[in-house]
């Protein structure tokens, strides 16, 4: 399944607030479609699927990528759900979003893909790069790159930079000073349901 490029508010109407996907708020509180206002009892599978979709759309990853992250999370020590969230939080595109270089995760990914971002002084255009403690993420020394980042920093997607990231606004750079913790994930999600969803599939 490829990355979603359709109407974003349609997704937030169905799944709720997704800060990584869009800043806009849905005007209608019920899901889209002809039967959106109908009250139906959802099955356990539907609830788990919805939580999985939240994760996929918020972080902008494909189904194949998410399966890969679930396998990695299982191989690590500790809670699979927490490990999964940490892996997604440490993606370069998400880190750029969290520090305000991009207005959304897709916006931050475009910044990375177009070569506007450096990691430890080297241009890195791989959005899935796993940031680790000690990494310095900065905007490339080009006028167009700086203008883009400065414009986005004036209106960041989220109000607070998480404590494991240290932003230096004047230098347009940030340092990863620790590990992403569960409590600083901006998305409202039950990651255990995502793990349960994949328990028989992966």
UniProtKB/Swiss-Prot annotation:
CDD domains: S4 (cd00165). Keywords: Ribonucleoprotein, Ribosomal protein, RNA-binding, rRNA-binding. One of its GO terms (cellular component) is small ribosomal subunit. Pfam families: Ribosomal_S4 (PF00163), S4 (PF01479). Residues 90-152 form the S4 RNA-binding domain. GO terms for molecular function: rRNA binding; structural constituent of ribosome. The keyword Chaperone does not apply. NCBIfam families: PRK05327.1, rpsD_bact. Belongs to the universal ribosomal protein uS4 family. Part of the 30S ribosomal subunit. Contacts protein S5. The interaction surface between S4 and S5 is involved in control of translational fidelity. This is Small ribosomal subunit protein uS4. It comes from Synechococcus sp. (strain CC9311).
């Amino acid at each position: 399944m490829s990355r979603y490029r359709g109407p974003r508010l349609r997704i937030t109407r169905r799944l709720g607030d997704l800060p990584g996907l869009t800043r806009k708020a849905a005007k209608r509180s019920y899901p889209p479609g002809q039967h959106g206002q109908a009250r139906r009892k959802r099955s356990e599978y539907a609830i788990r699927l919805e939580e999985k979709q939240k994760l996929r759309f918020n972080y902008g990853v494909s189904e194949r990528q998410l399966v890969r992250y679930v396998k990695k999370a299982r191989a690590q020590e500790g809670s699979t759900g927490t490990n999964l969230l940490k892996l997604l939080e440490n993606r370069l595109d998400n880190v750029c979003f969290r520090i305000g270089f991009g207005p959304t995760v897709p916006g931050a990914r475009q910044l990375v893909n177009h070569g506007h971002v450096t990691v430890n002084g080297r241009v890195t255009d791989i959005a899935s790069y796993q940031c680790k403690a000690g990494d310095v993420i900065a905007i490339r020394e080009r006028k167009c790159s700086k203008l883009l980042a400065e414009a986005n920093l004036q209106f960041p997607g989220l109000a607070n930079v998480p404590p494991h990231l240290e932003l230096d606004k004047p230098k347009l750079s940030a340092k990863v000073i620790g590990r992403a913790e569960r409590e600083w994930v901006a998305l409202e999600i039950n990651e255990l349901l995502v793990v349960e969803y994949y328990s028989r599939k992966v």
